[in-house]
């Protein structure tokens, strides 16, 4: 949970990555970091970026990017719980400021079960959540209410837990692999209709949530392949804004 060693130190938030095996959690995190490492988030003379001083994490990311560049394939599913520690920093007219630090837990999909005591403890000890659902799966199951309900089961369990414990922790729901949808065949409309039952459920419980659409395709380059990102880090920035009770880009010289 959020903590700080002194009043003036930036808070440290714990975020939990939730989703079934192969849904695209690790690719999302890599895509988010690519954007914020390359300073793509700029507005009104302000600039945001992630900073990571852990050499092991840097080596992990570099290894994944090399694999993508050489093979044109996504990384294999995560086999063990991985912690990623980052600092979110801002540069503006007043100089550089550390907004906050966060640790993102990225457990393997098979351990993301609400009846798993270790996973349950991670849920209760987290400050915010990124829940991942395969957009193509929603479209494929749109005409099968029972199968569609199973797709949302984990997210609904988390929402139930938040509601029963009277918690307003933010929940970012990331619909992955949207670049694979066939919009010429109305997959977009089918997707919107498919997520309606989940939205109705979350709103009934008054969960603090937002839905995001993620597209991180692999594209060919002169040097091989790379991940193509566009606003991939928006869900994490939204979580940071909610946890800090401020718009990330509405900050002036006085940073909370």
Predicted regions and their residues:
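Conserved G1/Walker A P-loop phosphate-binding module
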Residues: 2-78, 91-102
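Acidic, glycine-rich loop-and-strand cores that form catalytic or ligand-binding grooves
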Residues: 55-56, 176-182
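Switch II (G3) loop of P-loop NTPases
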Residues: 97-117
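Conserved nucleotide-binding/hydrolysis micro-motifs of P-loop NTPases
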Residues: 109-110, 136-138, 178-181, 217-220
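Inter-motif core of Ras-like GTPase G domains
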Residues: 114-144
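Conserved beta-strand/loop subsegment of P-loop NTPase cores
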Residues: 129-130, 159-179, 197-213
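Amphipathic helical hotspot of TIR/SEFIR-family domains
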Residues: 141-165
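Canonical P-loop GTPase G-domain recognition
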Residues: 180-248
């Amino acid at each position: 949970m959020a903590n700080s060693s002194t009043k003036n130190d930036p808070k440290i938030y714990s975020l939990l990555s939730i989703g079934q095996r192969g849904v695209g959690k690790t690719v999302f995190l890599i895509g988010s970091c690519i954007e914020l490492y390359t300073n793509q988030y700029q507005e009104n003379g302000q600039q945001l970026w992630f900073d990571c001083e852990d050499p092991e994490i840097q080596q992990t990311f570099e290894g994944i990017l090399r694999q993508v560049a050489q093979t044109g394939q996504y990384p294999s599913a995560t086999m063990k719980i991985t912690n990623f520690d980052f600092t979110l920093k801002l540069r503006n007219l007043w100089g550089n400021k550390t907004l906050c630090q966060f640790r993102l837990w990225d457990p393997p999909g098979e351990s993301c079960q609400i009846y798993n005591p270790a996973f349950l403890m991670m849920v209760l000890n987290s400050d915010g959540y990124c829940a991942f659902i395969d957009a193509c799966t929603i479209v494929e199951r749109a005409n099968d209410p029972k199968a569609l309900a199973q797709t949302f089961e984990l997210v609904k369990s988390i929402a139930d837990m938040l509601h029963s414990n009277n918690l307003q922790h933010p929940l970012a729901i990331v619909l992955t692999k949207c670049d694979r949808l066939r919009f010429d065949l109305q997959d977009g409309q089918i997707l919107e209709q498919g997520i309606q039952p989940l939205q109705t459920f979350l709103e009934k419980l008054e969960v603090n949530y937002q839905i995001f659409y993620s597209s991180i395709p692999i594209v060919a380059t002169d040097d091989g392949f790379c991940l193509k990102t566009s606003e991939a880090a928006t869900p994490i920035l939204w979580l940071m804004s909610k946890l800090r009770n401020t718009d990330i880009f509405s900050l002036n010289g006085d940073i909370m």
